[in-house]
Amino acid sequence: MDIRAEIQTRVDEIEQIIKRYLPAEEGWQKTIMEAMNYSILAGGKRLRPMLMSETYRLFGGKSKVIEPFMAAMEMIHTYSLVHDDLPAMDNDEYRRGKKTTHAVYGEAMGILAGDALLNYAFETAAKAFDMEPDNRNIGKAMQILATKAGIYGMVGGHVSYTHLRAH
């Protein structure tokens, strides 16, 4: 078995899962959807959804109910990168070899795209209820996802980093 080929196969599968959950670029919200999709499709290792999937399987998970959570996890990660790149934070112009979201769509749309990715992540994760409406673990998983992305998780960590950087 070639581990690099196996990892690339998994990354390709995850890319397809993510694409299935992205919003269609249409309607009066088209610009925000374009900015969201631009951000999340800019590449990346897809390590977080890969680890989530493998952990799910390790503990006996077999259904596709994990897939909306995999996409949601990558949306949350991407939102954090979009916001991190903003002028008020790190003011980066490039990420993964491409112009950052705010560099392409403007600062205001960069903020909105990050916000939209975070909210859309929870809309996406909630689609797991459509697959298994009686699965109580979905609610627990959503609670964990929210906590780990929020003030007691990723956002809280970024606040600490911002304070340290300011001093």
Where are these regions (language model features)?
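Conserved N-terminal diphosphate/IPP-binding helix and adjacent helical/loop segment
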Residues: M1-I76, V82, M89-D90, R95-A103
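Extended, well-ordered alpha-helical scaffold segments
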Residues: R10, I14, N137-I144
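Residue-level signal for inorganic ion chemistry
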Residues: L51, A121, G157
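Multi-pass membrane catalytic core of lipid/isoprenoid biosynthesis enzymes
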Residues: A103-F122
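Inter-helical turn/loop segments and adjacent helix faces that build the functional surface
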Residues: T124-A141
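Conserved ATP-utilizing enzyme core subdomain
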Residues: K140-H158
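Conserved small/polar residues in nucleotide/adenosyl-binding loops
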Residues: T162-H167
